[in-house]
Amino acid sequence: MFDGALRDHPWPVAQWTVVLVAALVAALNDLHSRRIPNLLTLPLFATGVTQAYLAAGKAGLFDSLIGCAVAGLPYVLLFLFAGGGAGDAKLMGALGAWLGLAHSLALLLCVNVAGIVFGLLYARRHGRLREVLTSISGTIWTTTASVLGGGGISQALRQPPSPPLESPLKMPYGVAIFLGALLATGSLLL
């Protein structure tokens, strides 16, 4: 997928090792307490930015901050508008600070894929798969009909949302972040 980007470069291997260990700690904590603590995410962010600056100066610092924004911003938006966890957003931002722009894009893609698969398996395990799929298909149908019907995206945004689930199904997304980080690391090693 990424043409063996890590095989011959020791520094990215060290960065991905930090990312995997931090994501594993976050996943285990999320499974146990349904929280990803600031005690993990804030030092992770600070050390990510610091190592980038020490390794490459201002350019490294800029790359680290852009990586933080690319990996973290989608999860900040999910936190603000869709009930995602703040810890998930902070963890993704901190991981992005360690990885910089290029590898944050790989991480984001792989975490999203892992999140979809893990989310569907989690819903199935809790007997809610049909309900979740119905909600997702209703949202897709309403949005597609609004856009194709000439109303455009602004019309789609004004549509009433799909009927809510009986009660929100909260999954420990730290697990999906760890699985996505594993997937991204594996794809970079191939």
Predicted regions mapped to residue ranges:
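A membrane-topology feature that recognizes alpha-helical transmembrane segments
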Residues: M1-L190
